[in-house]
Every structure is written in C-alpha cells, then in structure tokens.
Amino acid sequence: MDIVDVKFKEKEYSFHYRVVGLIVRDNKYLIQNIGGKDYYVLPGGHVRIGESSEEALIREIKEEVEIDIVREDFRLFCYHENIYEKDNRVEHWIEQYYLVDSGEKLGKESWSFVENDVDGVKTLNYSFVSKEELKEIDLKPLKIKELIISEEFSGISHIISG
C-alpha cells in the first residue's frame, strides 16, 4: 500500500487530519517556525491512511524532533476542529493535540533542520519558550495558544474554531 496522508485538496475545499505534540521540558514548550514565517506552530503532521493517531505522533516526533517516544510518554489533551476560509477555499482541519513528556531526551534549547517532503523543501526552526514568552509570540491556532497558557491539561478539551 502507498503511504498516503489523510488530506485532500480541491479547488473549493481541503481537509486535513493531523496530530500535534506539545513537548514540555523544564516548564518550557517546544515551538516550531517553518521557513521564517511570522508565526509559530507546534510540531506534528498528518496521519497516514491505516495509521492510528498514536502511531502518527510517534512517527512525526521522530521525523521532526529526532527523539523516540513511546505510548507512556504522551496523552491526548485536546481535540481541535479548525474550519476557516483561505484564498476562496474552505479549510477543514481535524487535529489531535498530545501532551508529550520528553524527559531528558532533548538536550538542545534550539535547533534547525531542512525537511524535504511532498510539499517541498523547508527549514524547520525549533526552540523552547516559557509561558511568559509564549504570550508574546504568534502561535497558531490562537485557541490552542490560549489553552496552553491556561495550562488546562487535566482533561480532554474539544475546541471548534474558525
């Protein structure tokens, strides 16, 4: 079977199913900047056909952050539906956010690497930020940023935005 991400794009709409990891170390959060854009995101990526969200998270964290995590290292804390219009197209994103305990696996404060995937070549820049620093940057989506700042991780939140 071909490796196929759970996403499709048409002229009038697109759909994406992703997993995202909120990696916490020493009360700081790992954020990602893609190709020098003016905003930040959390590391993650698309789930593949036939892959569970947990398998996808383990794979994506390995690919993007270069650490091995196991099921006991993470737990679901938010289910996010993000529906909005961009360039005359309806964008529909389903994202599952996991709180990831990286332990001592990540020793670096910041780093970059070049990723070459089906969407092209891009530089991914990573850094750990405190909650106070997080308040000052543009982390997308905004509702997730607000959830992180509030530190509401005890249950599973369901957020619909757009």
Question: Where would I find each of the regions flagged by the language model?
Answer:
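Local beta-strand/beta-hairpin segments that build beta-sheet-rich folds
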Residues: 1, 75-77
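Acidic, metal-coordinating catalytic segment for phosphate/diphosphate chemistry
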Residues: 1-20
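Short connector loops at helix/strand junctions that flank enzyme active sites
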Residues: 16, 24, 37, 42, ...
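Unchanged
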Residues: 47-72, 81-138
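Active-site beta-strand termini and strand-to-loop segments that position acidic
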Residues: 23-26, 100-102
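Charged phosphate-binding loop/patch that engages nucleotide di/tri-phosphates or the phosphate backbone
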Residues: 137-162
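Conserved Nudix-box catalytic region and its N-terminal flanking loop in Nudix hydrolases
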Residues: 24-64
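A residue-level structural signature of the nucleotidyltransferase/glycosyltransferase Rossmann-like core
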Residues: 13-14, 21, 39, 126
